[in-house]
Amino acid sequence: MEINTVLFDLDGTLINTNELIISSFLHTFETYYPGKYGRKDAIECIGPPLTDSFKRLDPERVEEMVATYRKHNHAHHDKLVEPYEGVYETVKTLHEQGFKLAIVTTKIRETAMKGLKLFGLDEFFDVIVALDDVENVKPNPEPLEKAMNALGAKKEETIMVGDNSHDILGGKNAGVKTAVVGYAIRGEDYVRQFDPDYVLRSMPDLLDIVGVKAR
């Protein structure tokens, strides 16, 4: 069957929040554990919900650390977030061609909307499934299934596009096709080991996969 539905991860996929996220983790690490953790540790934390990352450090202070992270993140958001080349044009083309589009992210809705609006992507998405909308996050299929239900989509006509293992595994668990961006911060070799159906060198590659000619 032809693909008519695209579920997108947000961070590291549609918008380049890598330096913002790393900066926010480093700020939080330094606040609670001065000199103990560095950039590599911050990169390891990218992907899962904040609560999972901070729970490994100190289960007793998770909420406090999440609040510290988010305060720094929101304060520096617009300065550190950057667009990825070809993303806006690709999403716009899919929207104009009548594709069903949704965001499936482990961010809270407020922060997700902040990123989408920064680059004018919010107008293309009627469905956003965020951390505060689900009981279970990727790689559990719940958020993907919730997005598909909201869109009236069939799994055999859907593809999940992301930049990390939980996006690929979440797609597989939901029974949909998967695509991963080759510009993922952990590198293409890392994401390939999770066996995505497609690897995108850049976002416009997605148009070929779903049968749309780039303009």
Swiss-Prot record:
Enzyme class: hydrolase
Name of this protein: Pyrophosphatase PpaX
GO BP field: DNA repair
GO function terms (MF aspect): inorganic diphosphate phosphatase activity; magnesium ion binding; phosphoglycolate phosphatase activity
Species: Halalkalibacterium halodurans (strain ATCC BAA-125 / DSM 18197 / FERM 7344 / JCM 9153 / C-125) (Bacillus halodurans)
EC number: 3.6.1.1
Keywords: Hydrolase, Magnesium
InterPro entries: HAD-like_hydrolase_sf, HAD-like_sf, HAD-SF_hydro_IA, HAD-SF_hydro_IIIA, HAD_2, HAD_sf, PGP-like_dom2, Pyrophosphatase_Ppax
Function: Hydrolyzes pyrophosphate formed during P-Ser-HPr dephosphorylation by HPrK/P. Might play a role in controlling the intracellular pyrophosphate pool.
Keyword match Magnesium: yes
Family to which the UniProt record says this protein belongs: Belongs to the HAD-like hydrolase superfamily. PpaX family.
One Pfam family matching this protein: HAD_2
A cellular component annotation (GO) from this entry: cytosol
Cofactor or coenzyme needed: Mg(2+)
Active-site annotation: D9 (nucleophile)
Catalysed reactions listed for this entry: diphosphate + H2O = 2 phosphate + H(+)
